[in-house]
Amino acid sequence: MMNIEYFNCGGYALETYEWFEFYTKEDNEEVKSIFEELKLNKNDEGLRERIIYQVESGYFSDINIQKYCVIELLKRTPRLRPILNYHELRKNEYGVALRFGEDDFHFVKYKNHKFSHKRGELKPIELPDEYKGWLGERANDQRYYSKIYRFAMRTADKN
């Protein structure tokens, strides 16, 4: 039996059942990776200070940070691919949505035509219909307000 305290929304949605984090490197290495991956101007001192502050604070509000996190997510999760909507899902895939807030991110799973999620150490729950508004592009629940990043996750091979 899985201990639900050992995984968060990312571990649940990606079905790794581990605690998921975006920032996995030392701060200075993470900042360097962001500038290299996104080909940002290293001489833009304002941008550099903003990115350093975001990484050191664990923030995600800067669009460059969000883009970097999505790129890293796709690199770390080979069974994941970006999609525009859930009509693109294949038979062996389920949907994953990701949004960012100021200092947090949240994943939602779309499987068998139902949305579900897991908050921190709480148990996963199916989302009520009225909560589906979070998944609308203009929806803003005051916590997660970024663009919605949608993905198709290929189910694990059962050998």
Q: Where do the model's predicted regions map?
A:
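...with weaker cross-activation on analogous glycine-rich loops/strands in unrelated enzymes
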Residues: K42-L122
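Generic structural signal for residues positioned in beta-strands
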Residues: G11-Y12, G95-V96, K114, Y149-R150
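Eukaryotic N-terminal accessory cofactor-binding modules
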Residues: E37-L40, G58, R154-A156
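Active-site or metal-binding loop neighborhoods of secreted/extracellular toxin and effector enzymes
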Residues: K114-N159
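Active-site nucleophilic cysteine motif
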Residues: M2-E21, K25, D62-K67, D104
